[in-house]
Amino acid sequence: MILTVTMNPSIDISYPLDVFKMDTVNRVAEVSKTAGGKGLNVTRVLAEIGDNVAATGLIGGTNGHFLLQHLPQNIQAFFYEIAGDTRNCIAILHEGQQTEILEAGPTIAAEEVNGFLHHYRSLMGATDVVAISGSLPAGLPTEFYVQLVEIAHQFGNKVVLDCSGVALQAALGSPVKPTAIKPNNEELSQLLGREVSKDLNELKEVLSEPLFEGIEWIIVSLGADGAFAKHWDTFYKVDIPKIEVVNPVGSGDSTVAGISSALSHQVDDYSLLKKANVLGMLNAQEKMTGHVNVSKYDNLYNQITVKEV
């Protein structure tokens, strides 16, 4: 089973408007509300491609119950309930633009942190891959994801970690490493304190730095240029076909789903990289975030090339 972890989920609310007027009333004809969070996007995609997937994380209040009710029926939900209310994230779509209002989310009490860790540990026996995604809510220490990685490894489980900032820095600085990470160029630049380009030789040097030592898989998205990857000491370049992008939001999460699925099925390097990239591309072709059209999978998969460099 693949277990996804979303520590700071949300109810994603979308308000489409022809014109957004400041300092007055704006009336909305239709509202879209979905269970949101990077980990839940991963969960939905894994369910759509037929993997055995379960979701955990923190939920609370009426929003938490709404989130549970709006998960697909074929997803096992093992969320841990907290006192605070799950946050709202509002997107106002207007004049071809998007204005976002993001709540910070609840502050997690110390006893809730300990309670979740005990709950998380109880799920490890039925799990083979853990996919951890997104930001940490207030109250959780910056090294919290390190604790989750360590517990997973105690049970022999692989971990795909998709986070940024201090949480990622803490994970990279720990002696306990995730199995796979997928930073982009911007995140690499932030980690190293210098500009990192898409030049393959530079990426080879960057991913060979001591900061990344001990991580089995590092997959760097290059957008329309595909991806660059390192598996232990072997480097790969992934080339992808041109596609019509409808909505790129959630493509990184879909890539995480592909990595997690491939690790669970223990496929070879080439198959892992193709699966990760095809799911990211399929998501970008859809209006809905965290959704893929599996009927297009094989055709697109066969157009992706992977070569050792």
Swiss-Prot record:
EC class of the enzyme, as a word: transferase
Task: Kindly tell me the pathway this chain contributes to.
Answer: Carbohydrate metabolism; D-tagatose 6-phosphate degradation; D-glyceraldehyde 3-phosphate and glycerone phosphate from D-tagatose 6-phosphate: step 1/2
The reactions it catalyses are: D-tagatofuranose 6-phosphate + ATP = D-tagatofuranose 1,6-bisphosphate + ADP + H(+)
Query: Which key words tag this protein in UniProt?
Result: ATP-binding, Kinase, Lactose metabolism, Nucleotide-binding, Transferase
The record's annotation in Pfam families points to: PfkB
In its UniProt record, which GO terms are filed under biological process? D-tagatose 6-phosphate catabolic process; lactose catabolic process via tagatose-6-phosphate
Q: Which GO terms describe its cellular component?
A: cytosol
Q: Record's Gene3D superfamilies?
A: 3.40.1190.20
Q: Under the GO molecular function aspect, what terms does this record hold?
A: ATP binding; phosphofructokinase activity; tagatose-6-phosphate kinase activity
Matching entries from InterPro entries are given as: Carboh/pur_kinase_PfkB_CS (IPR002173), LacC (IPR005926), PfkB_dom (IPR011611), Ribokinase-like (IPR029056), Tagatose/fructose_Pkinase (IPR017583)
Which E.C. number(s) belong to this protein? 2.7.1.144
The record's NCBIfam families line, in alphabetical order, gives: 1-PFK, lacC, PRK13508.1
So what family is this one in? Belongs to the carbohydrate kinase PfkB family. LacC subfamily.
Q: What is this protein called?
A: Tagatose-6-phosphate kinase 1
Q: What organism is listed for this UniProt entry?
A: Streptococcus agalactiae serotype III (strain NEM316)
Lineage of this protein's species? Bacteria, Bacillati, Bacillota, Bacilli, Lactobacillales
Name of the gene: lacC1
